[in-house]
Amino acid sequence: MRDYDEVIAFLGEWGPFQRLIFFLLSASIIPNGFNGMSVVFLAGTPEHRCLVPDTVNLSSSWRNHSIPLETKDGRQVPQSCRRYRLATIANFSAMGLEPGQDVDLEQLEQESCLDGWEYDKDIFLSTIVTEWNLVCEDDWKTPLTTSLFFVGVLCGSFVSGQLSDRFGRKKVLFATMAVQTGFSFVQIFSTNWEMFTVLFAIVGMGQISNYVVAFILGTEILSKSVRIIFSTLGVCTFFAIGYMVLPLFAYFIRDWRMLLLALTLPGLFCVPLWWFIPESPRWLISQRRFAEAEQIIQKAAKMNSIVAPAGIFDPLELQELNSLKQQKVIILDLFRTRNIATITVMAVMLWMLTSVGYFALSLNVPNLHGDVYLNCFLSGLIEVPAYFTAWLLLRTLPRRYIIAGVLFWGGGVLLLIQVVPEDYNFVSIGLVMLGKFGITSAFSMLYVFTAELYPTLVRNMAVGITSMASRVGSIIAPYFVYLGAYNRLLPYILMGSLTVLIGIITLFFPESFGVTLPENLEQMQKVRGFRCGKKSTVSVDREESPKVLITAF
């Protein structure tokens, strides 16, 4: 009995058909790159201070001293959320008293920003923060906005696979791209923070669903060798391209509504792809729609200038292949023994903390010294060599050592930021980018590593559970950034410490490189970290390794 890959082997590996599918599906990921990180600019918080209305009769000296000072990063700056009581200083101004000379400012009564705020417009002309005053008592709404987006991502990751299994890869791919583009457009007309946030969560659902289904469609259509490149470098690199495009849009469009409109329009260019991207023949076969599947393969053969054999698919053979039953498993199987439970708990921690590091570094760009647009571009650019490095390392070296190594690298350089003098801002930025490089490399290896640890029976469930843990990490990450408002170095100290910690834990995983993949839970129980013994090694065709999604989204 032949499998699907053997049936379509006559198409070749890298013909015009495969190249077209590779680049079109990868290109469909570009909007995910800039929509996923758009909150950096849509919800940017500029410098702000209490508004002192022009109608208040104050002398120029009292107007200049109407805001108390505080020490921030070693320098005196106006407070963002307090001002001196206007009635009091207006009375002093009318009496001709001078601040600091006739009146001790430290003894003056203070009040909150009763008349609103004035915002610095050097970086952002407007954001959702400036429009709805998400500062001071309401500053908690900003990280919550980002967290709820990732809650949408978490929900979308639940339903995307089930929808594509039921309705088909192609239909769900374009439906979810429409959801992402359509609701992003509706966000432009948000009248309050609540409306914006609900719509943003729906955009998150559409984004991850589009991403996952595009990945599934590519891995099912492309041949074995191309499948590896597509799943490791294709979607990752094009995601990074979208990430790098974001600051270019934001630099020239400083108003959040116009920026959102500009980020929405590229989604319309995906509409013509409907006529070029076919349905997955594998899915059609699973639905017993053999004639449609054969028609797609015939067109692919024609595009590749290959004469297809008559009767490509044998319905009886494929029906026999699809009727193979698998033993039912439940989530408790991931905790059946102490060894399996330990591996599962460590894997959940590894995914969650690595996700926290990746997203916290990505979202913390506005808090870096220097130009926020350049820093965001560099943050996206550094992902490209990180993905290539991860791909090369996975091909040649033991998994747990390379993952632990890049985590030590990423966490270590983040911890070094606290010893860099404030005058050397470029050094701090360089260390942040090196930390992002290490954590991104680690993140991109986790899917492959996790899939190789578990037997076939529970592999998808294990990857799903640990991937869910990474979504939880992304929901938590905005609050690491939020801590930067209290101390600029605190997020880096926490991220660096947790990344080094999880790097140490990674060393206790069993090694999967060059080892026969377990086929059942009993075989997995024999795997032990650091246990010296005879291991069954095989000449593993890397193209037969589990194919899994290896980017943050």
Swiss-Prot record:
UniProt cross-references to Pfam families, sorted A to Z: Sugar_tr
**Classification of source organism:** Eukaryota, Metazoa, Chordata, Craniata, Vertebrata
| Organism per entry | Mus musculus (Mouse)
Give the reactions, separated by semicolons, that this protein catalyses. Answer: ergothioneine(out) + Na(+)(out) = ergothioneine(in) + Na(+)(in); acetylcholine(in) = acetylcholine(out); (R)-carnitine(out) + Na(+)(out) = (R)-carnitine(in) + Na(+)(in); glycine betaine(out) + Na(+)(out) = glycine betaine(in) + Na(+)(in)
What parts of the sequence cross the membrane?
21-41, 143-163, 172-192, 198-218, 233-253, 258-278, 340-360, 374-394, 401-421, 429-449, 463-483, 489-509
Output the NCBIfam families linked to this UniProt entry: 2A0119
Instruction: Give the protein's biological function.
Output: Transporter that mediates the transport of endogenous and microbial zwitterions and organic cations. Functions as a Na(+)-dependent and pH-dependent high affinity microbial symporter of potent food-derived antioxidant ergothioeine. Transports one sodium ion with one ergothioeine molecule. Involved in the absorption of ergothioneine from the luminal/apical side of the small intestine and renal tubular cells, and into non-parenchymal liver cells, thereby contributing to maintain steady-state ergothioneine level in the body.
The protein's UniProt keywords, in alphabetical order, are: ATP-binding, Cell membrane, Glycoprotein, Ion transport, Membrane, Mitochondrion, Nucleotide-binding, Sodium, Sodium transport, Symport, Transmembrane, Transmembrane helix, Transport
Mapped to this chain, the residue ranges on the Cytoplasmic side of the membrane are: 1-20, 164-171, 219-232, 279-339, 395-400, 450-462, 510-553
Give the similarity note. Answer: Belongs to the major facilitator (TC 2.A.1) superfamily. Organic cation transporter (TC 2.A.1.19) family.
In which tissues is this gene expressed?
Answer: Expressed in kidney. Expressed in small intestines. Expressed in liver in non-parenchymal liver tissue such as sinusoidal vessels. Weakly expressed in lung and brain. Expressed in testis and spleen. Expressed in heart.
Segments on the Extracellular side according to the record's topology features: 42-142, 193-197, 254-257, 361-373, 422-428, 484-488
Please report the name of this protein according to its UniProt entry. Answer: Solute carrier family 22 member 4
